[in-house]
Amino acid sequence: MRCKICPRRCNAERTAEKAGGVCRMPAGLVVARAMLHMWEEPVLSGKNGAGCIFFSGCNLGCVFCQNGRISHENFGKVITPAHLREIMEDLVSQGAHCIDLVTPTHFTPWVLEALEKPLGAPVVWNSGGYERVETLRTLEGKVQIYLPDLKYAMERPARELSAAPDYFEAAAAAIDEMVRQVGAYQIGD
């Protein structure tokens, strides 16, 4: 496939055998870790933890990344959408309060395959906020919570630290789309 998933629209050739683009990932899914995670935001972790699935690679490549080994060193295992679904269902059966998809943007088409049927727990899209509105629209009805980490409001640091001078423009439009889909942030029981 020629990739246009994220705002970079890099048109990289991504096949099962060939990784490409800024994310340096092949077509298909690469997962670094899946686990019950007690240390996400408390409203996501609940009492049993969030079912976190950490995807490999990233469409931003920030120099300050807290998950650098996962994001920059291509650490992880290639899996199918069916296997991702099994992982999600297993985390739900372990009592996960939600399924927290961490840095999933560059794998959107394959994540969508895994989310074809309802899961029985809310799905969290935990990203760097650097998203295309068109890509987010494909997630409508599949994702219940968006958790974008808004990183920059100014072009210069976005360019210098993530090579994404259009970051704020793309992220602002993406957040508007996220709110359109699921509504504004609310805390309840």
Name each model-derived stretch:
Residues 19, 24-146, 154-156:
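Conserved Radical SAM active-site core
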Residues 170-189:
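Conserved C-terminal portion of the radical SAM core fold
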